[in-house]
A protein has these predicted regions:
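Short, small-residue-enriched loops and turns at beta-alpha junctions
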Residues: 4-5, 28-32, 82-85, 114-117, ...
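Mid-to-C-terminal alpha-helical segments outside catalytic/metal-binding sites
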Residues: 132-140, 154-194
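Active-site gating loops and adjacent loop-to-helix segments of metal-dependent hydrolytic enzymes
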Residues: 17-19, 82, 103-106, 157-166
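A short, acidic, flexible beta-alpha connecting loop/helix-capping segment that sits on the rim
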Residues: 113, 147-150, 182-186
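Mid-domain alpha/beta scaffold segments of enzyme catalytic cores
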Residues: 1-47, 53, 90, 124, ...
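Catalytic pocket-lining loop regions of alpha/beta-barrel enzymes
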Residues: 34-143, 192
């Protein structure tokens, strides 16, 4: 956990340990705030880090101007929390696509359960959003499990079902390989796979 008081030496130390981003959890009151995004983005950009945003749709809409100004890559958690039942018709979806089009934004295909109104096993509403992301920008997607699902206290989702959703969202093996292997290599600076 970092805030704007973190030293450059500490950021460099963390970089040496493999840290590649700062997560702003704006879904809950906590250690990170929207006001920290720009100054921290500037400081970690030269390290090649990204800023990761976990926030409800209304909060992302509030900070969209900040996100348009930051220099570092952006990663949106949980399909960018596109609200259901509006899905791709919600204004946030257009905001996210516009940021993707700028070439520095990624979306994490994770948390299909986070904003669904339909639920398991198909999560058909969230799945529809994920499929459009795959169609429009497969080169800007990474997958995540969100295990151990800290936001879900009582009814933890089935991780096998969540992983299998990727077969529906990205039916072509080469696209899944891109999402699971090539894109994380690019985003996190992993060594290229053979």
């Amino acid at each position: 956990m970092v805030d704007t008081t973190v030293s450059d030496a500490e950021l460099k130390r963390m970089n040496g340990l493999g840290v590649r981003g700062i997560r702003f959890n704006l879904a809950q009151a906590g250690a990170t705030t929207p006001e920290m995004i720009e100054p921290l983005s500037k400081r970690v950009n030269d390290l090649g880090w990204h800023i990761q945003i976990n926030a409800p749709a209304a909060k992302i809409m509030e900070i969209k101007d900040i996100l348009n100004r930051v220099s570092s890559p952006i990663v949106f958690d949980h399909l960018a929390h596109i609200p259901e039942p509006e899905g791709t018709a919600h204004p946030l979806f257009g905001v996210v696509l516009a940021l993707i089009d700028k070439g520095k934004t990624w979306v994490k295909l994770s948390g299909a359960y986070a904003d669904t109104k339909v639920g398991p096993p198909s999560y058909s509403d969230s799945s529809a959003v994920a499929r459009v992301y795959v169609q429009k920008a497969p080169e800007r997607l990474v997958w995540g499990s969100d295990w151990p699902h800290p936001s879900e206290r009582d009814n933890k989702p089935d991780d096998a079902i969540l992983f299998d959703l990727l077969l529906d969202w990205a039916p072509e093996e080469r696209v899944r390989n891109r999402i699971l292997v090539q894109n994380p290599e690019a985003l996190y600076g992993f060594a290229k796979s053979a």
